[in-house]
Amino acid sequence: MYLFRIISLNLSGVFLFLSYTPLYITYLLGVVISSMMLTVGTFAITLDIILCILVVCFLITTLLVIDSVLDSIRGLNSVGVLVRIIQYCFLWFVFSEFMLFVVFFYTLYSECLLINVEFTNIGCPVTTKYSNIILDLGYIFYWFLFDFFNIILNTVYLFISGLCCNNVLSSILCREYLLSKIILGSSIFLGLLFIWNQVWEFNILIITLSVNIFCTILFSIDTLHFMHVLVGIVFMIISIFNIQSKKIGDIRIVLIVCIIFYWHFVDIVWFFLLRFIYLDTLMVLK
């Protein structure tokens, strides 16, 4: 059955609502944790951040138990159980990937002492080793002069692509399959532009793991994010083929929601890169 038919039924409507609730709660908590880290300006793990991470784990586990009990009461078939498994496995996958990026950034900032660099009367925490790397042979000035516009373009590409993904589900609910394919195609196109710009950036700046420490950090984290963008594009291409078949049932709807959720996760990671790698460099150069 199509999603709009399922929602019109009370029982299945409650089931689908409960299926989406953990995704939304986890997404909102991820935004809260990200906002805290971006506001603090460093990856020093505080008690508040640890508590938020524990709350995420507790909520996912609690919702899994509640959903399992409700599924047994309603007597859902094997398809419903499969949807539930897909949903929670994907949640744990995204959460583990989020923690992987947190470890990368935390390793960068925890091994160095923080100093206060005055920038327009605002204290900007930058590591001692990091500031020395930035001033190394004027290399980073070259990077800033020729690559900053490309960074802004990449940010715009991912931001608009995320906005496009938000409209996919509503177009499917209205049976606007052609519109949903156009929206997903636009997101894929913007993602490919992002990949092209990243490859161009690495080529023109000759960034490798052996140039200097700054390039090692930039190359490692950017390459990891690059692979996540590539995986997201593959997922969206698969979704287009699923929409083309016009067999949009429970499982495929949940998969599309998971893909949208994953793409927003990629957006959040890019804003982390923009804040802690690129903008910190700009502040020191100023």
UniProtKB/Swiss-Prot annotation:
Annotated GO MF terms: cytochrome-c oxidase activity
Reaction equations catalysed: 4 Fe(II)-[cytochrome c] + O2 + 8 H(+)(in) = 4 Fe(III)-[cytochrome c] + 2 H2O + 4 H(+)(out)
Keywords associated with the record: Membrane, Mitochondrion, Mitochondrion inner membrane, Translocase, Transmembrane, Transmembrane helix
GO BP, sorted A to Z: aerobic electron transport chain
Subcellular locations according to the entry: Mitochondrion inner membrane
A Gene Ontology term for the protein's cellular component: mitochondrial inner membrane
Known EC number: 7.1.1.9
Cross-referenced SUPFAM superfamilies: Cytochrome c oxidase subunit III-like (SSF81452)
Presence of the UniProt keyword Membrane in the record: yes
Keyword hit for Oxidoreductase: no
Membrane topology type: Multi-pass membrane protein
Main localisation: mitochondrion
Residues passing through the membrane, by range: 13-33, 40-60, 85-105, 133-153, 173-195, 199-221, 223-243, 253-273
Matching PROSITE patterns: COX3 (PS50253)
Subunit structure: Component of the cytochrome c oxidase (complex IV, CIV), a multisubunit enzyme composed of a catalytic core of 3 subunits and several supernumerary subunits. The complex exists as a monomer or a dimer and forms supercomplexes (SCs) in the inner mitochondrial membrane with ubiquinol-cytochrome c oxidoreductase (cytochrome b-c1 complex, complex III, CIII).
Record family assignment: Belongs to the cytochrome c oxidase subunit 3 family.
Described purpose of this protein according to its UniProt entry: Component of the cytochrome c oxidase, the last enzyme in the mitochondrial electron transport chain which drives oxidative phosphorylation. The respiratory chain contains 3 multisubunit complexes succinate dehydrogenase (complex II, CII), ubiquinol-cytochrome c oxidoreductase (cytochrome b-c1 complex, complex III, CIII) and cytochrome c oxidase (complex IV, CIV), that cooperate to transfer electrons derived from NADH and succinate to molecular oxygen, creating an electrochemical gradient over the inner membrane that drives transmembrane transport and the ATP synthase.
Protein name as it appears in the record: Cytochrome c oxidase subunit 3
